[in-house]
Structure formats: C-alpha cells, structure tokens
C-alpha cells in the first residue's frame, strides 16, 4: 500500500519542501514559476499538474495545497471527475490494447494520488459522486493485477472506516446537543438533580485539565482540513454555475468545536455563580485557576482560553466580594499569557514553544499542542480576506494558497496526537452534558449572590427575577 509521509515532513525550515518527490519540470503551459516556486496558474493547468504520468508525480505539498484550495473554485466531485478523465484518457487506461508495462508504471502513481486524497480529505467521499468516480478509477487500475487489487481494496476499506467513525461521532454530538438543557429550567423542575458541583465530581484540578484535553483532542481530530476553507467559501467570479454553493460550506465539525469552547466558558461561569456562600465561590474560582494553569502546562491553550473567558464574563467579574477572597497571582500570570495586546504576542510565543516541544517530544504528553481555536480561524480568515483568490489575468493566486496550506497542515499535525491520559467517563459525562446557565440566568445568579450596585443593575435584576423566576 502506498505510504504517505507525515504532515510534519512536508515543510523544511524555509517553508515548503518541494523535493520530497523528484519531479520533472511541468511541460504544460499556464503555470508561472519564480525561483522554482509555483506562484500562479490557470485552473486547468493546475488540475493537469495534479495528475501523475509515467515520468512525473506531483510533490505532496502541491497535492495537499491544491486539494485544499481547489474547492474555492469548484466542487470536489467536479475535480475528481476531471482527474479521472485525465487519468483514463492520457494514460490510456480505457484502451485494452495499451501497453501493459506502461500501465504497470502509472498505476501505482494514480493509486498513490487517490490514497493521499482519501486519507487527507476523507469527508469529500461522503458525496456519492466522489465515491462512484473513485471506485471506477480504482477498478481500472486494479483490473488484471492482483497486487493493485489488494491495495485498492485496502484503500477503500480504510476510507469506509473513517466515514463510519465520523457518522458515529456526529450521532454522539446530536445526542449530547438534544440532552443539554438550560440549568435554570432544571433547577426549577428538579432542584435535587444537580446539586453536585464540578469539585464534587472531580476534586483534582490536574485530572480535570487532562479530561478537558481528551475532549479537545477528540473534537479536533474530527475537523477536516477543508472545513477551514469551506468556512470562507464565496462565489468564484469566473464560475458560471448559478446554483447555490452552500453545498460547499460544510463546516459542522468546526462549528461543533467552537460550540464546545462556548459551552466550557459558560460551564465555568455557572459553577462559579451557583454557590450561595462567598467562600465556596472563591474556592471554585481558585479551582478553575489551577485547572487553567495545568491546561497551559499541557499545551491545551483552547481550554485555557475558554476558562479565562468564563472567569472574565461580567456576571463573574462583578463579584467583587468573592474575588477579594481569591489569591489571584496565578490568574494574573495566565491572563498575561493570553493577553490580546500586540496581536496575542505572548500567546503566540507560548504556542511556538509548545510546537517546538512537540517536534522534539520524548513522550506523547510533550506532543500535545491545542491552539486557541478562534484565533487560528481568525488568522486564516484574514489571510483569505487579505489576498485575492485570482490575479487580474484570471490565474489562481497559488502563492496565497501555499501560505494557507502551511497554516492548515500545522494544525493537521497537532490534531493527530493521541491523548496519553486515562479517560474518566464520569468526569467526561459531566463536562459534556451537565446543564449550564444562559447569560440571563448567570446575571440573575450573580445578583442573587452579590446584590446590584447601581440603578441599571437593580432594574435588570427586577426584570430577570420577573422573566426567569416569575417573581417581582
């Protein structure tokens, strides 16, 4: 079975390593190079550059970059149809009289390309049209050669397993989503059902940080690289197809991950605002500071930022009497690390340190890098917005897409890390399903704990008591 090198091998210190596969200079027109780097090309020429022949196999960085960015210009099934056509016609796979030796030379290369596509962008093949074309081309390669037949079978079985795992994951997400209810509703109907706070479920902040890392890595793992591009898909001005392109905007796993960040922030705020006694609220704040600190040590920056966001929500930050009982030195250090000034300079420095540690890791724990996800999306958004997809001559601006692919492939390396910590089902269940307060309910709980300080807060408190509790 053709093996693809790991994502970390795609780059050298200067950026893209174009020498992983020795390839001849492209003979078809429509591609523009500078210093041996591909900068732009017509869409047609770029598609041809993707297709191997007897003497040529595209560099892996090119394959990843083009498969990632091409969806801004055409549907993956349209690209697959073109690739199949070029393979069949140019390599004469459909001709029974074609040279068997030539087919033996080209077949492993086409199979390698299909393997790279199915391994890196498996979600493309949820589309029946993609799967049909894949099986058709694979069948042509495999006919008459037992070795290729086994390899094709292995590739398709591996793809089907990945798609089945994705469907299962989506079912679990849907189940979690349908069972999560507003905490205030539960409190009013079954007050005894959620007496347990997070410290009762998990008294050790280090263990909680590890369980948060489990959730983060599982959710990261299911995000397809294409979702970063599909999140910003817009109609290509040179595309004459007037049909809706929303089909390309499939980002459900990315959205589920952003929702998890929001849930964790609200969970932190809920756990802090819930206790009636001031000392219990202060203890809860100190507990989450320790959890956040351990997240930082692990390299789990997403949970760290979600916890800080929860503690900085107005209903929590206004609890001045509670905060007065908290030793905040450790929290101040964490806030400094995630300070948004200078475009998150401190965080980016820490992230680079974690990424470097991951590259030279001696243990699976040292490999963990979980970026602050909203900032990663923002960076990719600004990269996408800051440069045109096409140049004035209609060429695809490939220089932009090298940079996009570089950012996404780094993420791909991080998301493939196995979580080394033991799973605790009880803690995970609590983190994922315990009801949390809405923003209004958080404010109400906050005012009930420490009364309103001015007329605006008093009016809001009365309004919330009336609307949420039915009291005046």
UniProtKB/Swiss-Prot annotation:
Domain Ras-GEF: 204-452
Keyword Iron belongs to the record: no
N-terminal Ras-GEF domain mapped to chain residues: 34-164
Any GO CC annotation of this UniProt entry: plasma membrane
Function, as annotated: Guanine nucleotide exchange factor (GEF) with specificity for RAP2A, it doesn't seems to activate other Ras family proteins (in vitro).
Subunit comment: Interacts with CCDC124 during cytokinesis. Interacts with Ras family proteins.
Protein name, entry field: Ras-GEF domain-containing family member 1B
